[in-house]
Amino acid sequence: DIDNDGDTDLVLGNLGENFYLRASNNAPVKVYLKDFDKNGTIEKIFSHTINGEDMPVFLKKDITEQLPALKKENLKHQDFAPKTIQALFPNNLSDATVLTVNTAASIIAINNSNKGFTVQPLPYQLQLSSIQALVVDDINKDGNKDILAAGNFFDLLPQFCSIDASYGNLLLGNGKGGFIVAKPQQSGISINGQIKQVLPLQVKNQPGYLFLQNNQHPLYLRKTNAGKK
């Protein structure tokens, strides 16, 4: 309950807005799901919107390795480069399942009871990288819910750079749905790994949080009496 009105609100992590693929209502990212080569495996083909057209996200090499039948009609990069998804698969999209992405922002959705949700993006500092882990808790003990967020995402194809701009963030809530991003010297959080989960954990009756990192030791941050870390 972010705004203290008695109902359940949502805090949702996402890729963030500092990545090659940027999605909006007018320029969505799409995923086409189908067994294109009829080998019993569902392929995933991604597109993004350029000048109003659905263009392939992945490189020619990656798509033709996944679907070798496309090599014959796309022998050269200059053959492949201008083609839309519809031109690549002229007869194969009508029965494909299409998923549409309209935003990559991490958001808060405030519950308006029977009137749906009001969606607002998290502050820009949290859009600089992906958010993989969230904890909502009254961290500074002022009676209002705060947000502890961490993430980064390194497991991408070489054509994309890693999403690695997050060192973890603490957002201090005002109890009305608003938040202030605590400075690192205030929060004590500075983690440059790929965080997959954050768990509240008490050690010797001292409350804190365990940050679980890919290919690294877990990191435990203890809350001080002032509620800082």
State where each predicted segment sits.
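Beta-propeller-forming repeat regions
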Residues: 1-229
